[in-house]
Amino acid sequence: MKRRDFCKGLAVTLAAGALAPGAALPQAGAATALVGRAVPDDYYTLWYRSDRCSADLRHDYYYSDSLFDHAATEYDDKLALATLGMAAAADSSWESDQYYWMTGEVGRADHIRDAFAKLGFAEVQLFNYTHSLNDAPDTAACAVARKTLVRGGRQVTIIGAFVRGSGYGAEWSGNLHAGSGSAHTGFVAAARQLTEKIRGYVQASAKRQPLGTLKLWMGGYSRGAVVANLLAARVNRELSGLERENVFVYTFATPVALGPQDYPDLQQDYDNNHNADGSLKESWGESNIFNIISSGDIVPHLLPEEWGFHRNGNDRFLPSTRNEEELEDLNEMGKNDFGPTPLDFSWLATDKETDEVMLRMEEYFISRENYHEKYEAALMDMTQCAFIRSEEEVTQNKVLDDGEVIQRLRTLTHLKNMDYWKISRAVWAASTMSRAVLKRVDAENIPIRAQQIVVPILAVGLCYGLESEAVSLIAKYILMFVAMKSAPDDAIRAAFCHHCENYIALMEYYAPSEHCMEATTRT
């Protein structure tokens, strides 16, 4: 029997209740619902956005209200997978991108609404989902809902809060807003705002009805993961009566955000994988915050730990692999379980390859201070340009002419006050450079999205006086990732490890005992 078949069989057996009698958990069906509803212990189909396939896909996850019966400091793989499903559902739907430029309710939160309904949660509130995806604020969208049950004679309220981590458009530029202090400015600002939103939701719920024992279930993927990681520390301090053992936090593909100085309100179990002298612990310490990280994924390495940044809680690394049997199993999953575009695990980066990419980046940027002073504004505006789309660009595949590019650049956060003729000269030079850059992306089949953004991206870099070769290289990588173009390049292979499907497959394939304290590749 192949490893995957055994794991599936074991999961089905457990889901059917074939546990030792003494270990059986209370069934959700025995509960009385006061708000929302109790649901059977079962697998539920949740939708998620797939940037890899340019589509909305669905996947099945096990859920039970009894997953919250134990202390949050106890790692629970079934709860982790359910959280990943909810975190992915919190992303903007792919279908809603047809209204990319619009402000208002256009279906961005359709997947998380559906997920909450299937799992029996009610009183859904959405924060920041109605912004146009052309906006670039230091915020994050978040979906919150609750259910209040009477289980075993005790009243319990479970509040789910999931932060959007994909499909957020020009908000992407905030991922590069490190700032000059000892914490990532963009992530901290988003976490502080959402703390107030969640506190308001809890207080309003408590006014309507006693909550009983409050349990908070939080999660996020990528940008959503780091904001949820910071939120986890803050809500324990901000919400009276909320015990740490009742705050269940699972994050995925989590960037680092905090240095050791300042911001004590955003720190909890900080850098929990390491001792005070920086050495790796033998095993995880106690925490209610679990960060699940694919060993080859480059995003959790930004900003570099060598610059003094770490996460709250316990980092659990999913292994990369070069083991032939494991690759065969994973590639079978990649062909059958995640949409029309096969996911080839043998092509994804190992931890060593990703480390080499990061080393080259650190050598280029030199230090955190040098990055902030010389590159941060340029990279933020280059990225913002990659994610701005007008109605004509979305619906008619319009490619801006040079005059229109000049006007767009004059709306960017850091270029509003730059001399008109300096911007114009940069755009004209970028038009000339663009043909060579597009050929480096795909000489025969240049995607329309790459054609739309190549001149604006190049022009921004030139406006800031970056070297032409550096501007071309940065633009190439942005174009390849936006256009989902694979290439035999370690940086692209490391970036493609970031796809949500990679995390789902690795979580389902590897047992918790095979999670690692640091990035690892199996052979």
Identify the role of each PLM range.
Residues 1, 21-43:
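C-terminal segment of N-terminal export signals and the immediately downstream linker at the start
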Residues 33-121:
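N-terminal low-complexity, Ser/Thr- and acidic-residue-enriched intrinsically disordered segments
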Residues 248, 253-342:
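The feature captures the conserved acid-bearing segment of alpha/beta-hydrolase catalytic domains
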